[in-house]
A protein has these predicted regions:
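C-terminal cap of thioredoxin/glutaredoxin-like
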Residues: 4-24, 105-192
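Beta1/beta-strand and adjacent pyrophosphate-binding region of the FAD-binding site
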Residues: 1
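Structural alpha/beta surface segment adjacent to cysteine/selenocysteine redox centers
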Residues: 6, 10-110
Length: 192
């Protein structure tokens, strides 16, 4: 399982390469803000001691991987609840991966604020999701409850940040751990 938050630049960096390393990974969008809150912390983007260094790290990783210059949305971080709900909506239509990539590319390649409903709807439009249907669903209590449940499941599985990958019960947290997760998958495949 590959857990992502759309406003996490490290989730974006991992999402851009996970299909090469873990082609059968099942994507799961979560509400990162709720995961931070459950663990008694907030986004590193709000921590002055970490912010500049981590932003520079993300920019360097993006450049090294040929993803172009990272363009930070303003403001960042922003409220990601609507885009997290939209990821769940997209998942139900078999479009989570393209939607999540479109949304994260809008955020980190174009500098688009995904805290704006219009941006979330545009990400849906780009991947062929009916925008009117998406708009209605984002306000629906059932989708709100489903996001809470998906996030609670991630927390119960041990997820404390995004991106995270779980392979055979082992948690790999961070963009820089994808290779280890892929190696664990290969080891599991050869031991069965």
């Amino acid at each position: 399982m590959f857990f992502i938050g759309a406003m996490s630049p490290y989730s974006w960096l991992a999402a851009e390469r996970i299909s090469q390393l873990l082609p059968h990974a099942i994507w799961q969008g979560v509400f990162a803000g709720a995961i931070f809150k459950a663990n008694g912390r907030s986004s590193w983007g709000l921590d002055e001691q970490q912010r500049d260094a981590r932003m520079a790290d993300c920019e360097a990783r993006a450049a090294a991987r040929g993803l172009g210059p990272l363009r930070w949305p303003q403001p960042w971080p922003t409220n990601d609840v609507a885009v997290a709900r939209a990821m769940l909506f997209a998942e139900r239509r078999g479009a989570l991966e393209p939607f999540a990539l479109a949304a994260m590319r809008m955020a980190f390649c174009e500098g688009t604020d995904l805290g704006e409903l219009s941006a979330v709807l545009e990400a849906g439009r780009r991947v062929g999701i009916d925008v009117d249907e998406l708009r209605r669903a984002l306000a629906d209590q059932e989708l709100k409850d489903a996001l809470r449940a998906a996030t609670a499941e991630a927390l119960a599985a041990g997820v404390f940040g995004v991106p995270s990958v779980i392979v055979e019960g082992q948690l790999f947290w961070g963009d820089d751990r994808l290779e280890e997760a892929a190696a664990a998958t290969r080891r599991g495949a050869t031991s069965t």
